[in-house]
């Protein structure tokens, strides 16, 4: 694979405190997994920014809980202690600390899309408008959860004819390792390429070598 900085962007899906800061998260990833995915994503973002790749953070944010409870499944499970998404009606309400992007992952010059209301980061947001304006044809997806928002966004990106790379080291799921791995396999079979950080950086270096040989 060859990746070119001018036509590639990272779409960081819900890498905010609502999932990744156990002290305030309403739908938390396990603490040890938070630290790992943050460290891996921060390293990848820093190296990609250095070669000119744009980082776009997409953040779930609701004006009020009724915007969440209008989904019948979420309304049904919000107070079920057996469900991973219990308490979802309190998740990332406007003004809450959960809506803040993890500081280690944000840098000046990054772009932010805050309209996300459902699993698909394209739905009712200006994400596609932004990608097209930037001349992007390839997206590198990172974020939480592999099993929901990353998965749905990957399928929608391929439906809109973007080339999809999933940064396998920089995604994770509150649904556990087995479901996380299944989601990666499903995306690999259907919509795109799960690559490690090392493989992603290698793909950019390969494109640079091709350019020098012309």
Q: Each predicted region: which residue ranges?
A:
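Short beta-strand segments at enzyme active-site cores
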Residues: 12, 53-60, 66, 167
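A short alpha/beta connector and helix-capping loop motif
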Residues: 6-8, 24-48, 52-55
């Amino acid at each position: 694979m060859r990746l070119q900085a001018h036509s590639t962007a990272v779409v960081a899906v819900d890498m905010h405190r609502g999932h990744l800061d156990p002290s305030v998260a309403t739908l938390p990833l396990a603490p040890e997994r938070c630290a790992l995915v943050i460290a891996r994503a921060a390293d990848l973002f820093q190296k990609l920014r250095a070669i000119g790749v744009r980082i776009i953070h997409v953040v779930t944010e609701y004006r009020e809980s009724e915007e969440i409870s209008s989904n019948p499944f979420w309304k049904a499970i919000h107070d079920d202690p057996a469900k991973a998404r219990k308490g979802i009606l309190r998740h990332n309400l406007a003004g809450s600390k959960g809506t803040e992007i993890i500081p280690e992952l944000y840098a000046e010059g990054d772009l932010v899309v805050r309209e996300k209301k459902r699993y698909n980061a394209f739905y009712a947001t200006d994400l596609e408008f932004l990608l097209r304006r930037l001349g992007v044809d390839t997206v590198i997806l990172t974020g939480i959860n592999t099993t929901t928002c990353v998965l749905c966004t990957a399928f929608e990106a391929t439906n809109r004819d973007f080339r999809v790379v999933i940064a396998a080291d920089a995604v994770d799921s509150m649904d556990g390792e087995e479901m996380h791995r299944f989601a990666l396999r499903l995306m690999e079979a259907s919509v795109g390429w799960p690559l490690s950080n090392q493989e992603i950086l290698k793909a950019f270096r390969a494109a640079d070598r091709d350019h020098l040989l012309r």
